[in-house]
């Protein structure tokens, strides 16, 4: 794990905060100013003006948060110390963390694929076959939410998603025509996500450093979601090749996408009490600060290239949360909706049903076995 962390540090480097690698941010969002000239780009996505937010009882007014961005270097130092003596494995590896009535990892994976396709279409993506591996990538980015996968197992192919290894996905992205430097960026953001999510689950001392600090919590939370890597591939699906470590628009879109989701989850009543709740503490004040940050990210995107894609992606949480089964299952008491036959037909092509080489030892139980089993559908 320490080797992975050091590799990430070398790739990303520091952002505007010295000592922040690999949790790099190029832009200091506390200092963002409203663009001087508004463009018609504000018509893309869901635009809720800051002065109109109090009209909605599930929203309210805004307030600038105290800047805690510089504290990210302290978080890095904490993680460095933890990794010095961290065990190679944890007893909870491959534990299902969805909080729902899942029977096994294979079932979780099917539901993750359902959720992936749902997110993608809300972001504005197409289910065209040429996006197959981009969708598998998003699924890989979603699985650590619901299963505690060790990053090493993800990288070396011990863990497979519906029969697909990470190397399969890498080769597939290149075959779909995604430029190699964009594939590398997407790969490294996914490695970073796997590492930060795993550390968040196994290090009991990390969360206390983040709670009640809106900008610091946001910095870490966006890394665990990997919305930046997903945005890179969404743009690639539209033939738009952008994205490097200095791309402020990608940063702001990835931040706003997480914030729009949290705002909608709070409106739906499913944010409070989450293990990784972003507004735990003085919830009323922290929600005001979160909305302040969201508004400024969206205003920044108004003046950026490709706003027609990025603003929809950034604000999409406001409409996918109340519509997607993933979140409605939480309203239902964390009970899964059965997979209907029509859904199973959509999911079937994403399952690799050829035999998968087995491995000896404890890893053998964690290679996806669904490859030879039909999808169970609701009658």
From Swiss-Prot:
**Cofactor(s) listed in the protein's UniProt record:** Mg(2+)
Pathway as given in its UniProt record? Secondary metabolite biosynthesis; terpenoid biosynthesis
Any keyword Magnesium? Answer: yes
| Phenotype caused by lack of the gene | Abolishes the production of humulene.
Its domain of life reads: Eukaryota
Q: Provide any one GO MF term from the record.
A: alpha-humulene synthase activity
The chemistry this enzyme catalyses reads:
(2E,6E)-farnesyl diphosphate = alpha-humulene + diphosphate
Q: How is it used in the lab or industry?
A: Eupenifeldin is a bistropolone-humulene meroterpenoid first discovered as an antitumor and anti-leukemia agent. This metabolite also shows anthelmintic activity against the parasitic worm Hemonchus contortus, anti-malarial activity as well as antifungal activity.
Keywords, A to Z? Lyase, Magnesium
User: Which GO BP terms apply?
Assistant: terpenoid biosynthetic process
EC number(s) given by UniProt: 4.2.3.104
EC class of the enzyme, as a word: lyase
Q: What does the similarity note say?
A: Belongs to the terpene synthase family. Alpha-humulene synthase eupE subfamily.
Function, in words: Alpha-humulene synthase; part of the gene cluster that mediates the biosynthesis of eupenifeldin, a bistropolone meroterpenoid that acts as an antitumor agent. The first step of eupenifeldin biosynthesis is the biosynthesis of 3-methylorcinaldehyde performed by the non-reducing polyketide synthase eupA. Oxidative dearomatization of 3-methylorcinaldehyde likely catalyzed by the FAD-dependent monooxygenase eupB is followed by oxidative ring expansion by the 2-oxoglutarate-dependent dioxygenase eupC to provide the first tropolone metabolite, tropolone stipitaldehyde.
Q: What is this protein called?
A: Alpha-humulene synthase eupE
């Amino acid at each position: 794990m320490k080797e992975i962390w050091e590799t990430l540090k070398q790739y990303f480097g520091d952002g505007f905060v010295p000592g922040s690698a690999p949790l790099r941010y190029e832009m200091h969002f506390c200092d963002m100013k409203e663009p001087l000239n508004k463009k018609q780009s504000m018509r893309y996505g869901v635009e809720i003006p800051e002065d109109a937010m109090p009209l909605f009882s599930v929203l309210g007014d805004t307030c600038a948060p105290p800047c805690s961005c510089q504290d990210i270097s302290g978080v890095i130092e904490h993680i460095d110390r933890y990794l010095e003596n961290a065990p190679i494995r944890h007893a909870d590896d491959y534990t299902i963390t969805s909080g729902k009535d899942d029977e096994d990892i294979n079932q979780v994976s099917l539901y993750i694929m359902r959720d992936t396709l749902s997110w993608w279409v809300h972001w504005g993506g197409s289910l065209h076959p040429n996006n197959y591996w981009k969708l598998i990538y998003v699924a890989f980015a979603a699985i650590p939410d619901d299963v505690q996968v060790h990053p090493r197992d993800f990288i070396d192919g011990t863990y497979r998603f519906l029969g697909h290894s990470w190397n399969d996905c890498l080769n597939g992205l290149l075959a779909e025509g995604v430029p190699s430097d964009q594939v590398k960026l997407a790969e490294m953001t996914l490695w970073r996500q796997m590492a930060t999510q795993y550390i968040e689950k196994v290090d009991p001392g990390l969360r206390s450093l983040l709670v009640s600090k809106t900008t610091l919590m946001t910095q870490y939370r966006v890394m665990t979601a990997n919305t930046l890597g997903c945005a890179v591939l969404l743009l690639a699906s539209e033939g738009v090749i952008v994205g490097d470590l200095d791309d402020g628009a990608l940063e702001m879109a990835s931040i706003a996408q997480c914030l729009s989701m949290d705002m909608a989850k709070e409106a739906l009543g499913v944010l409070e009490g989450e293990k990784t709740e972003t507004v735990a503490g003085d919830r009323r004040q922290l929600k005001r600060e979160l909305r302040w940050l969201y508004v400024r990210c969206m205003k920044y995107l108004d003046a950026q290239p490709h706003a027609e894609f990025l603003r929809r992606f950034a604000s999409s949480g406001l409409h996918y949360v109340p519509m997607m089964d993933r979140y409605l299952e939480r309203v239902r008491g964390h009970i899964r909706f059965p997979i209907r036959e029509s859904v199973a037909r959509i999911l079937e092509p994403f399952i690799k049903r050829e035999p998968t080489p087995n491995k000896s030892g404890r890893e053998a139980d964690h290679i996806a076995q669904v490859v030879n089993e039909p999808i169970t559908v609701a009658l």
